[in-house]
């Protein structure tokens, strides 16, 4: 693809607005110190322009901008300002500490905004653009002008606004899809026509700022690049107003992966992407969904047997980029009900088990049976299956009775031991679960120190079951167990026995000698 490159910039400039537009996402506000921490990460990521805030909106933003200006000397630091003299003066003052400052002024241009928000005519909008861009340029040489709601603005008027802003001294023209309304074909054409027709367009950088209301923010930003845009405004994890903005990690990796098509890349240090994404998640408390492109937990995870088999042959069969290129350590072969025998055998081999063909077949059958009971199978589950294949089954719950004894509870449990004999024991405790665990300890001879215990519902309505999860210690080693039943007390007993039986199996095989292997 060959598109005339405005201003002959050698790469797509990444304008990150996580600290301004991104922070406007409900629940994502940051303190000045948190903004500085995030800005440092954006600097290390290689972002060209960091939009640091909206100084006229709060003292907190002014403080944050000044802090970033004193410390960050490489990237351009931008601040947002309305087309108001007081805003521009406040913004210019906030940028006094910055080595590479940019004033970013904006004004709505669409008929809807002109009539209902601004109550201004076309002529008044043009006059305001000229006056305030000129004012901004008097303070700082690098001035960006944004025509808010550009994609719903009459194109002839948008061309006139652009011409006036360029003539007044704007160095970057941003054409936002403020409400995520446009489509790739429309925005590509808009940029292409304006760059070709507006006087002075070859002297400025054209920029796209796309929102994700229809899920098209990244696609529209790529289309704008095809139309000649050479700056893209985006945020980490795509956070921002309403449905968010163009996601930095997605747009930059699209340019890198499809480099042969776009013939232009960003300067982003892509192996820093995942750590930067995770930092933002911690700072604002907004985790990304697991299937989020590039940075989601499942972005490089493979469960399907067909996919796993292909990945084992050649990773390019089902991955278009390397996880290491964005900061993940490696691809994940997730074991679950869709996994094939080859993936299970490979994982067992990695755990140190070398099996004959018949043993692999038997293990895979047991693996598939386990997958009917739980969504994912961990390494510990595989180890337990291997232990089950070579030693007798452990203790099984035959019956239990819980009763109140004054302020305390009494538990009677009857178990079947590994040889099939019945073992019955009683115990008292401070509540039914405490009594139950005491009786189980007496019956099995296994002493477990309880660290945590949780129960929750699994399923919906009449089919719901209780799942008990517990974390215990034995000889200083931490173990975890789960149990599921219609009765939560029974589920608790099964969770306790889950740990005890695995511990006993490991002991019988000589896997543990007091403190060797943990069961997870």
Curated annotation (Swiss-Prot):
PROSITE patterns: AIPM_HOMOCIT_SYNTH_1 (PS00815), AIPM_HOMOCIT_SYNTH_2 (PS00816), PYR_CT (PS50991). Pathway: Amino-acid biosynthesis; L-leucine biosynthesis; L-leucine from 3-methyl-2-oxobutanoate: step 1/4. GO terms for biological process: L-leucine biosynthetic process. Residues 396-520 are annotated as: Regulatory domain. Signal peptide: none annotated. Its EC number is 2.3.3.13. GO terms for cellular component: cytosol. Residues 12-274 form the Pyruvate carboxyltransferase domain. One of its GO terms (molecular function) is manganese ion binding. Keywords: Amino-acid biosynthesis, Branched-chain amino acid biosynthesis, Cytoplasm, Leucine biosynthesis, Manganese, Metal-binding, Transferase. The keyword Repeat does not apply. Its cofactor is Mn(2+). Disulfide bonds: none annotated. The keyword Metal-binding applies. It is found in: Cytoplasm. It catalyses: 3-methyl-2-oxobutanoate + acetyl-CoA + H2O = (2S)-2-isopropylmalate + CoA + H(+). Belongs to the alpha-IPM synthase/homocitrate synthase family. LeuA type 1 subfamily. Homodimer. Catalyzes the condensation of the acetyl group of acetyl-CoA with 3-methyl-2-oxobutanoate (2-ketoisovalerate) to form 3-carboxy-3-hydroxy-4-methylpentanoate (2-isopropylmalate). This is 2-isopropylmalate synthase. The gene is leuA.
């Amino acid at each position: 693809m060959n598109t005339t490159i405005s201003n002959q910039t050698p790469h797509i400039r990444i304008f990150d607005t996580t600290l301004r537009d991104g922070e406007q996402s409900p629940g994502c506000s940051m303190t000045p110190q948190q903004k500085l921490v995030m800005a440092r990460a954006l600097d290390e990521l290689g972002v060209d322009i960091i939009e640091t805030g909206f100084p006229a909106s709060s003292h907190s933003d002014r403080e944050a901008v000044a802090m970033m200006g004193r410390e960050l000397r490489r990237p351009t630091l931008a601040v947002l300002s309305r087309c108001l003299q007081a805003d521009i003066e406040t913004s210019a003052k906030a940028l006094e500490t910055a080595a590479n400052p940019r004033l970013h002024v904006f004004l709505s241009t669409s008929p809807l905004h002109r009539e209902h928000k601004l109550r201004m005519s076309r002529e008044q909008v043009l006059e305001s653009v000229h006056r305030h861009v000129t004012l901004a340029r008097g303070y700082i040489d690098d001035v960006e002008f944004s025509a808010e709601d550009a994609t719903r603005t009459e194109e002839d008027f948008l061309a006139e606004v652009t011409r006036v802003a360029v003539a007044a001294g704007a160095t970057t023209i941003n054409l936002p899809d403020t409400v995520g309304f446009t489509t790739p074909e429309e925005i590509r054409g808009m940029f292409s026509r304006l760059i070709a027709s507006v006087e002075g367009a070859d002297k400025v950088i054209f920029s796209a700022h796309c929102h994700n209301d229809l899920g098209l923010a990244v696609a529209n930003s790529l289309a704008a690049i095809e139309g000649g845009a050479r700056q893209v405004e985006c945020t980490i994890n795509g956070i921002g107003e309403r449905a968010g903005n163009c996601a930095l990690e997605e747009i930059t990796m699209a340019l890198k992966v499809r480099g042969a098509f776009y013939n232009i890349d960003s300067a982003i240090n892509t192996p820093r992407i995942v750590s930067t994404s995770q930092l933002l998640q911690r700072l604002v408390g907004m985790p990304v969904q697991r299937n989020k492109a590039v940075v989601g937990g499942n972005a490089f995870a493979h469960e399907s047997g067909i996919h796993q088999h292909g990945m084992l042959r050649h990773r390019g069969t089902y991955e278009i980029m390397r996880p290491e290129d964005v900061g993940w350590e490696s691809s994940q072969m997730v074991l679950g009900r869709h996994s094939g025998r080859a993936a299970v055998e490979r994982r067992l081999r990695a755990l140190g088990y070398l099996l004959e063909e018949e043993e692999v077949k038997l293990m895979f059958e047991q693996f598939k049976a386990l997958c009917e009971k739980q969504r994912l199978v961990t390494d510990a589950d595989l180890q337990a299956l291997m232990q089950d294949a070579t030693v007798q089954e452990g203790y099984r719950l035959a019956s239990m009775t819980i009763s109140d004894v004054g302020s305390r509870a009494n538990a009677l449990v009857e178990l079947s031991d590994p040889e099939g004999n019945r073992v019955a024991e009683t115990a008292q405790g401070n509540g039914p679960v405490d009594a139950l665990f005491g009786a189980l300890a007496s019956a099995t001879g296994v002493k477990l120190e309880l660290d945590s215990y949780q129960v929750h519902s699994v399923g919906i309505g009449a089919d719901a079951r209780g799942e008990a999860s517990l974390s215990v210690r034995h000889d200083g080693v931490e173990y975890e167990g789960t149990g599921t039943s219609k009765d939560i007390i029974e589920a608790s007993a099964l969770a306790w026995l889950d740990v005890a039986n695995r511990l006993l199996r490991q002991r019988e095989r000589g896997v543990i000698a007091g403190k060797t292997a943990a069961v997870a």
